[in-house]
Amino acid sequence: MNSILAIKNIIIESLSQAMEKARQEGQIPALSVDISIEHPQKTNYGDYATSLPLRLAKATGKRPMELAQILASYIETGSGISKVSVAPPGFINFTFSKEWLCSLVKTILTEAGSYGNINMGGGSRVQIEFVSANPTGPIHIGHGRGAVLGSTLSNILKAAGYYVEEEFYINDAGSQIDAFKRTLFARYQQALGKDAAVPQDGYHGQYMVDLAAEMVTKYGDKYLQMPADIAQNDLGEIGMARMLCLISDDLKALKVDFDIWFSERSLYSGGQYKTAMDILSGNNYIAERDNATWFSSTLLGDSKDNVIVRSDGTPTYFASDIAYHYNKFIERKFDRVINIWGADHQGHVSRMKAMVSALGINPERLTTLLFQMITLKRGGELVRLSKRTGEIISLREVIEEVGADACRFFFLARSTESQMDFDLELAKKESAENPVYYVQYAHARICSILHLAAEKQLDYSTGDTDLLGEEAELELIRKMAELPEIVETVSRTLEPHHLTYYAQELANAFHQFYKDCRVISDNAELTCARLKLVDASRIVLARTLHLMGMTSPESM
């Protein structure tokens, strides 16, 4: 019973039993209510608190404080709880026992890299699709935020006991690919001295000029020696593959990798598009009008029907979405699918739910997370264009300037629905003002203490953690205890910004401990106990950084 989640469940069960005992004694009527507990803002109120008496007051006709005292009288201490108290205007507070806190240090040292793991998912299969940028140009910081959200959620859900696959959906079947191919062929001809115009709907960035030059270096004028339509298609395929490699390299620089790169084209060549359409037609969700094929999403509560095949016979993006989600849920049998999209896809969410329902799938199994964009700043000044290219700044440039760890932390630092400012100068500061430096410096400081202990040949393996008792020591343990709860919270809410807050709070608790308590002293027994605490801190902080996809430096 060394997990904070186990204690949390014990507290909730004890409150439920207290309500039943109070009912049996005629002190309150039979009531059905969800019992919740939370950490008080001030630690002097205990480690957990519930406002249950405030919520029961109206139904029972009793004052909240009277209810708090009644319920508290039926709750026994023990099982990691040393104190149960009441506080105005009607809270019941619970305090962890020192014995449980000290024993947790041993638990952390034993579990090591698996500390924080929980079995919430039970092996349930989850697919997370994110980034999925068109393979027609470099990815930018907006894509970077989606990438970090997706990879961090994958880390967390794996820690929570889910089987997770991370997937990049390659949009390689739409009109944008045709425009890319026409643009590249025009730039290729220009690079060889030919007169060719870049199409109006093409891609006008410098990167296309560079890509064409790369093609000339590798293939010479090979593609001028064949029919233009064949040359344009073949060269375009090579160019698209090269662009995907560049996108993959940029994402790897951000420490983001994928299990699957899924081609949109395969939905059509593999027959899954037709199968999905047949299901919708069989369920009477397909209509023909205005020379187009429509999905009757209004039958499922959407505000309007949606075109899936245009009057010219070409499928829409939504048609591909239908086939893709048929593939996810029915072909590959994922229990849950999470799509991470930019906020500009807000209008697509309701029709996606309707489409999944029309395929005969519970729409609750589909979650779409929308994230807001990032405003890039330098010392408070807005950064609009790249100094290098004069165009929109790429993700690669930001990573090269501030590093992958800083990018990941700042991209996670706000909730997905919040727009965020990313100050490049702040991200590079080596001071406590920079949260990335502050957190990683705590880990480096921990490692320096352990290195010093090793130099002094201090064997702390037999250290007695029951000797710990200073306020700063216990506060640090309390904060370390929260990691499994953070994993549970993020897995339930899909809000990974909680990790960044937790990392800063944990680092702060360690820095305060370091300030208040001398680790290596003349007291050999206390030194060993504190070295155990320091080592446990290393494990928890490194685990937190790992979940965020960041490194844990041993020196800075």
Swiss-Prot record:
The keyword ATP-binding applies. This is Arginine--tRNA ligase. It is found in: Cytoplasm. InterPro entries: aa-tRNA-synth_I_CS (IPR001412), Arg-tRNA-ligase (IPR001278), Arg-tRNA-synth_N (IPR005148), Arg-tRNA-synth_N_sf (IPR036695), ArgRS_core (IPR035684), DALR_anticod-bd (IPR008909), Rossmann-like_a/b/a_fold (IPR014729), tRNAsynth_Ia_anticodon-bd (IPR009080). Belongs to the class-I aminoacyl-tRNA synthetase family. Monomer. A motif ('HIGH' region) lies at residues 133-143. Keywords: Aminoacyl-tRNA synthetase, ATP-binding, Cytoplasm, Ligase, Nucleotide-binding, Protein biosynthesis. The keyword Ligase applies. Its EC number is 6.1.1.19. It catalyses: tRNA(Arg) + L-arginine + ATP = L-arginyl-tRNA(Arg) + AMP + diphosphate. SUPFAM superfamilies: Anticodon-binding domain of a subclass of class I aminoacyl-tRNA synthetases (SSF47323), Arginyl-tRNA synthetase (ArgRS), N-terminal 'additional' domain (SSF55190), Nucleotidylyl transferase (SSF52374). GO terms for biological process: arginyl-tRNA aminoacylation. The gene is argS. Its main location: cytoplasm. GO terms for molecular function: arginine-tRNA ligase activity; ATP binding. It comes from Dehalococcoides mccartyi (strain CBDB1). GO terms for cellular component: cytoplasm. Transmembrane segments: none annotated.
